[in-house]
Amino acid sequence: MAELISFVVPTQSDKVLLVWDLSTGPPAEALSHSLFTVFSQFGLLYSVRVFPNAAVARPGFYAIIKFYSSRDAQRAQKACDGKPLFQTSPVKVRLGTRHKALQHQAFALNSSRCQELANYYFGFSGWSKRIIKLQELSGLEDAALAVPMQKGSPQFLCAVEVVLPPYGCRSPGVGISEEPLRQLEEGQSSFLMKRKTAQKLAFQAAVSDAFQKLTIVVLESGRIAVEYRPTAEDLDARSEEELQNLIQVSCSSWSQSSQREEECLSDFSLEEEDLKLCDPH
């Protein structure tokens, strides 16, 4: 049976491993590194988190490891359970258990995580992304009312397209971001920094949005396929000019973007050729 992998934070119990009976010698950071080295051999990991045992238990640590693929998690569990791995005593490895009645909201992966997942399954040359439109929204309302525009918080809208040539697939995405400009942060340099940050965040949100419409299909043979599920607005956006319809709809749902996984700017790098579209004249 084929496995479907979406570009969301993995929460299903069959993708989560619980590892315990970890020794007390190494610190938690060293244990996390060792666990990552061992378990990443079975597939791409979302996270490795190490915790100290409860006070009522004997000294030691346990870990929670999240895979993107349930198949990878099951293979890792069978291969590592009861083995010493990187320590002298064996560890216990179990698949996570969770009551079926519990429902957890699926949070979209941030752009860095989306690209990491795409690189793993499609290869670095198996996909690409491009900016279709980058528009500054700050002051547009004042301009429409013929009111002199004041320098406020920079707000940008970005439309991108993720392209997968081997699969003949294109997925559009839209993101909006605003960087609040406080009164104490006056001056041209502060405004330009906020403006550049807003551009980056809008780009990140657009890339993540494009990946949300894609699902990785891992066949039993190990081959990879892609499922594309466009929204109704995407079906109307057949050309770059028609993307205005998609942009207008996305503006109305901007408030929903706060529910997505937060992304740190330190994990993101925007190529200079992308920024050429953003530089103020």
From Swiss-Prot:
It is found in: Nucleus; Cytoplasm; Nucleus, Nucleolus; Nucleus, Cajal body. One of its GO terms (cellular component) is nucleolus. Pfam families: RRM_1 (PF00076). Residues 15-98 form the RRM domain. The keyword NADP does not apply. Keywords: Cytoplasm, DNA-binding, Nucleus, RNA-binding. The keyword Cell wall biogenesis/degradation does not apply. PROSITE patterns: RRM. Residues 1-92 are annotated as: Necessary for nuclear localization and for nucleolar accumulation in response to heat shock. InterPro entries: Nucleotide-bd_a/b_plait_sf, RBD_domain_sf, RDM1, RDM1_RRM, RRM_dom. Transmembrane segments: none annotated. Disulfide bonds: none annotated. One of its GO terms (molecular function) is DNA binding. Residues 90-133 are annotated as: Necessary for nuclear and nucleolar localization. May confer resistance to the antitumor agent cisplatin. Binds to DNA and RNA. Homodimer. PANTHER family: RAD52 MOTIF-CONTAINING PROTEIN 1. C-terminal half contains cytoplasmic retention domains as well as determinants involved in its stress-induced nucleolar accumulation. This is RAD52 motif-containing protein 1. It comes from Mus musculus.
